[in-house]
């Protein structure tokens, strides 16, 4: 088995947060932190340096997962993915996140999405096709295509 991904989970609903945390740990990953607000999440990103941040788009305290994604993007070197039932609310660039996982999702959908995201983090470009229930940002798909063609280093799209 490969080394577990270090994952930070940002979700404002406690029961959903616990369920996601349990699913991640059962899949063999390491949850390095959980946050229910953007402020907590941004502090934990700096403190824990996760490899992957799973972010709910709408947070209950009035903050937005977009704020978290922007902080992750600014820090660099960390992959972000949204989890939301409202994927159409995201702009095409997904605020710099790699992907969005549609809620509600099953354990299978989450596990397949994590396999894809693990390849994004550790072995880009992913060799698997995008799993059902997940949408990848067009800039990331283009970057992966360039990597496969050998015309770009193995990293995601340039951050502006």
PLM region spans:
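Short amphipathic alpha-helix used as the core "switch/output" element in two-component signaling
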Residues: 63-78
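A Lys-centered signature of the CheY-like receiver
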Residues: 103
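Conserved acidic carboxylate
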Residues: 11
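Active-site residues of response regulator receiver
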Residues: 56-57
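Acidic, metal-coordinating helix/loop segments flanking the phosphotransfer/catalytic sites
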Residues: 21, 34-52
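CheY-like receiver
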Residues: 112-115, 119-160
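Two-component/phosphorelay signaling modules centered on CheY-like receiver
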Residues: 14-33
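Hydrophobic/aromatic residues positioned on beta-strands within the core alpha/beta folds
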Residues: 83-84
């Amino acid at each position: 088995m490969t080394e577990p991904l270090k994952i930070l989970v940002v979700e404002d609903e406690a029961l959903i947060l616990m369920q996601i945390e349990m699913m991640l740990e059962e899949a063999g990953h390491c949850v390095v932190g959980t946050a229910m607000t953007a402020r907590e999440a941004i502090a934990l990103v700096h403190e824990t340096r996760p490899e992957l941040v799973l972010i709910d788009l709408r947070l209950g305290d009035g903050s937005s997962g977009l704020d978290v994604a922007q902080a992750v993007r600014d820090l660099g070197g960390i992959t972000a993915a949204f989890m939301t039932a409202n994927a159409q609310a995201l702009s095409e660039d997904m605020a710099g996140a790699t992907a969005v996982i549609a809620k509600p999702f099953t354990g299978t959908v989450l596990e397949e999405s994590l396999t894809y995201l693990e390849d994004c983090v550790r072995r880009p470009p992913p060799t698997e096709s995008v799993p059902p229930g997940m949408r990848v940002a067009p800039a990331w798909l283009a970057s992966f295509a360039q990597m496969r063609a050998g015309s770009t280093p193995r990293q995601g799209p340039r951050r502006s």
